[in-house]
């Protein structure tokens, strides 16, 4: 269970606060106006940016001071963060090791991850030889192989067309349910939230609000979200 206790994130003149309790094995969408700090929030949560005060707790343990690799979190970025000179197998294997040599056990783990995202037989392909959807699947396989209970997603499927994006969202939902993962997904598209998010958090006016049922939020969006969506 993820708790944020009076968390404050400062970057220059920008400031963001968040106090949340009891985020569990659900999919949470994070929405808000452009420039509200959604990506900054995820980066700080993952440990890539410092927090000014407050605490991040996982199952009651304070993890605020842990390095990114030590945290129970895996992050999927908008650009997939794949290395163009490495094969799909090697890109996924980076979740386990940076060494070039893979033991037979690790090779099987990588193959299993690629199989789970529908890319069996694509181990030798480099990112430039893959479609956008396939690249997203490679990145998702790498995240899955990290086997972390919290998944952080920063608009990972934005560059995909509607059909491919929905396919990836559905796959993400299935995998999250299988693993009982806590998923925080930044998105600018209300349809993404409606499709897979159990609850939605609004980030506006430098404050991250507590989650509410997604259907409820979209049926009667707060003023800031309504303005962002062009509904006011």
Question: For the regions a protein language model found, what residue spans apply to each?
Answer:
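Short coil-to-helix segment of the ABC ATPase nucleotide-binding domain corresponding to the Q-loop/switch region
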Residues: 86-95
